[in-house]
Amino acid sequence: MQNRPKSVLTPARLGTSGVVRNTLEDPWVRFQIELEFVQSLGNPDYLTFLAQQGCFDKPEFINYLSYLQYWKSPSYSRFITYPFCLHMLDLLQSPDFRREVAHESVTRFIDDQMLLHWKNYLRKRAEMVNKHVQSLDAMATPGPGPSS
């Protein structure tokens, strides 16, 4: 039998005293859990589920969403794979948005907007980069010098 390294995703790990400790006390596990949760906020269907379950009516949950704002800082946001989740985290700070996201029509609208963004992003970005390069080329091209 091989000795495999213990995974960081095990439900519980041993503390320095050999006693099993709560996984939320482990900073690495907590980091992973919070990262996964923040990224799940980019899923409009999940937001609708949370709203329909009444999570957005609980002050503790609202405070947790506020606490998670630290993920917007560059030292943490560099770990984010789906940056749209940070925009959704911002929107979730609004009571109006939390109330409206419970409706399927709002979820479909958000889904549609995300798909349109993904569909057109690369083309629009390429156009913007080309315009920028052209403007840099125009600035770098020296004009006629003084006449002698």
UniProtKB/Swiss-Prot annotation:
Intracellular or extracellular location(s): Nucleus
Pfam families named among the record's database cross-references: Med31
Domain of life, per lineage: Eukaryota
Entry keyword annotation includes Transcription: yes
Function: Component of the Mediator complex, a coactivator involved in the regulated transcription of nearly all RNA polymerase II-dependent genes. Mediator functions as a bridge to convey information from gene-specific regulatory proteins to the basal RNA polymerase II transcription machinery. Mediator is recruited to promoters by direct interactions with regulatory proteins and serves as a scaffold for the assembly of a functional preinitiation complex with RNA polymerase II and the general transcription factors.
Protein's name in the database: Mediator of RNA polymerase II transcription subunit 31
GO CC entries: mediator complex
